[in-house]
Swiss-Prot record:
An MF annotation (GO) of this entry: mRNA cap binding
Region feature Disordered, mapped onto this chain: 526-550
Gene name of the record: eif3d
Protein name (database record): Eukaryotic translation initiation factor 3 subunit D
InterPro entries, sorted: eIF3d
Transmembrane segments: none
Listed Pfam families: eIF-3_zeta
Taxonomic classification: Eukaryota, Metazoa, Chordata, Craniata, Vertebrata
Bias-annotated ranges (Acidic residues): 532-550
Domain writeup: The RNA gate region regulates mRNA cap recognition to prevent promiscuous mRNA-binding before assembly of eif3d into the full eukaryotic translation initiation factor 3 (eIF-3) complex.
Organism (species): Xenopus laevis (African clawed frog)
Length: 550
């Protein structure tokens, strides 16, 4: 007979629920689970992922999050291989980076949504007004030369530079050479020069100027001496030499202008006279050829008005004045001189020799191939005595500081003693053409040293008083390498210009550097251009006009 068997009831008198675990459920793991969970799964591909970690813990399901039912492999098998899926602990920087990236994504999304909303609600009239405003803005920017850079700063438009001489309508262009083509020129078959004649006398350098620093600066004195800047055809020595030797004649300053022309920015001109089979390179009378430019190759060269203290011409006249005075002040004036065999050819009989600047002239000859016989008048500014008493010829030039706030300048009074390399690097950037010409002249003359003086204004707003802050000495060959001046390229440019001039007919020509382009042009000039007779006729006409007006 069937018998009812009463179940065992666990009575929990102190609480709710069973007081003991049945035997069949002992040691059984438990976790919240869902019927959709797979027991013993290797990887969880069903869980929902959130890109934004802020909402992960709030809205994600906790079912299947435990590891009680996960599969753990006890023994290694050859059929498959376990993969380490543990996550690397992120640094605080990585966590913050992800947080900022998510925030930026939300902002971009909100901005796009707002822009889309505005475009949807913008009426046609407002759209048309916005288009008109943008169109006018672009038009004004093109008209006034305003260009917005990435940092929203407008760069001032450079003024167009003036030509060194006005090109007339009856001048004909014979040749045009651009700088990129000239930079590729090379000529290496240059023989060593031979000295034809040496003239003049030079004074000895005062080594006390080598001890000048910014703490014991020395005032620059105004020295009244005569400087002769005679052009090629007016040189009596070159006229004498042209009868017997040479077919190309020039001065070192004119040749250096041509040989380093690819660094020039401002306009300059050289007169070429073809007489028979000979060529003479000249400079125009009363031109600015001998004025020293200031910050010519700077990114933002001086562009003040003509009457301003810092206008390009006033700065050039100031630099020339400083260079002349320093080149004489740093010598032992009135004392022993180093004299060449021949006297100075430019001193007149009624002029005191002590009133003439210390300059010696060396006439040298180069053979450029079989057909070019070059004769050049070179200059020395002084001499030095070495430790063993040997004599070294030097060229003395001056760098001047006018205002360190412009042209990315460096304050010389603070940096010249401690960071002289930074000063010369800045000057090389702002005056690359001038330094290259000086170096080329020193190499042509065969000077052993190039002396550079650093002269600054006593007051920034006063261009009449200056002080010497220091000096520096270079060997021309080493300095040419430092400033990346290739003499092979310089001789190549000169040979190219000479070959072109040799193909021209007899007459007068002009080599002109374009004021706003990297181009030099050769013009043929009518008879009488730049002659003294033409200037006298112009003066007579001016006098007649003044008499009629009076």
């Amino acid at each position: 007979m069937a018998k009812f068997q009463a179940p065992v009831i666990n009575d929990n008198a102190l609480g709710w629920g069973p007081c003991a675990i049945p035997d069949q459920f002992k040691d059984m793991p438990y976790q919240p689970f869902s019927k959709g969970d797979r027991l013993g799964k290797v990887a969880d591909w069903t869980g929902a992922t959130y890109q934004d970690k802020r909402y992960t813990n709030k809205y994600s399901s906790q079912f299947g999050g435990g590891s009680q039912y996960a599969y753990f492999h006890d023994e290694d098998e050859t059929s498959f291989q376990l993969v380490d899926t543990t996550k690397m602990q992120k640094t605080a920087y990585q966590r913050n980076r992800m947080r900022f990236a998510q925030r930026n994504l939300r902002r971009d999304k909100d901005r796009r949504n707002m822009l889309q909303f505005n475009m949807q609600t913008l009426p046609k009239s407002a759209k048309q007004k916005e288009r008109d405003r943008l169109r006018l803005q672009k038009k004004f920017q093109k008209q006034f030369g305003v260009r917005q850079k990435w940092d929203q700063r407008s760069q001032a438009q450079l003024k167009p530079r003036d030509s060194s001489v006005e090109v007339r309508s009856d001048w004909e262009v014979k040749e045009e050479m651009d700088f990129p083509r000239l930079m590729k020129m090379r000529y290496m078959e240059v023989a060593d020069p031979t000295d034809i004649e040496c003239c003049g006398a030079v004074e000895y350098y005062d080594k006390a100027f080598d001890r000048i620093t910014t703490r014991n600066e020395r005032p620059l004195r105004s020295i009244k001496r005569i400087f002769h800047t005679v052009t090629t055809t007016d040189d009596p020595v070159i006229r004498k030499l042209a009868k017997t030797q040479g077919n190309v004649f020039a001065t070192d300053a004119i040749l250096a202008t041509l040989m380093c022309c690819t660094r020039s920015v401002n306009s300059w001109d050289i007169v070429v006279q073809r007489v028979g089979s000979k060529i003479f390179f000249d400079k125009r009378d009363n031109s600015d050829f001998d004025l020293l430019t200031v910050s010519e190759t700077a990114n933002e060269p001086p562009q003040d008005e003509v009457n301003s203290l810092n206008s390009p011409r006033n700065l050039a006249m100031e630099a020339t004045y400083i260079n002349h005075n320093f080149s004489q002040q740093c010598l032992r004036m009135g004392k022993e001189k180093h004299t060449f065999p021949n006297p100075n050819p430019f001193i007149e009989d009624d002029v005191d020799k002590n009133e003439v600047a210390s300059v010696a002239y060396r006439y040298r000859r180069w053979k450029l191939g079989d057909d070019i016989d070059l004769v050049v008048r070179c200059e020395h500014d002084g001499v030095m005595t070495g430790a063993n008493g040997e004599v070294s010829f030097i060229n003395i030039k001056t760098l001047n500081e006018w205002d360190s706030k412009y042209c990315n300048g460096v304050d010389w009074r603070q940096k010249l003693d401690s960071q002289r390399g930074a000063v010369i690097a800045t000057e090389l950037k702002n005056n690359s053409y001038k330094l290259a010409r000086w170096t080329c002249c020193a190499l042509l003359a065969g000077s052993e040293y190039l002396k550079l003086g650093y002269v600054s204004r006593y007051n920034v707003k006063d261009s009449t008083r200056h002080v010497v802050l220091g000096t520096q000495q270079f060997k021309p060959n080493e300095f040419a390498n430092q400033i990346n001046l290739s003499m092979e390229n310089a001789w190549g440019i000169l040979r190219c210009v000479v070959d072109i001039c040799m193909k021209l007919d007899e007459g007068k020509y002009l080599i002109l550097k374009d004021p706003n382009k990297q181009v030099i042009r050769i013009y043929s000039l009518p008879d009488g251009t730049f002659s003294s007779d033409e200037e006298e006729d112009d003066d007579d006409e001016d006098e007649e006009v003044e008499e009629e007006e009076s």
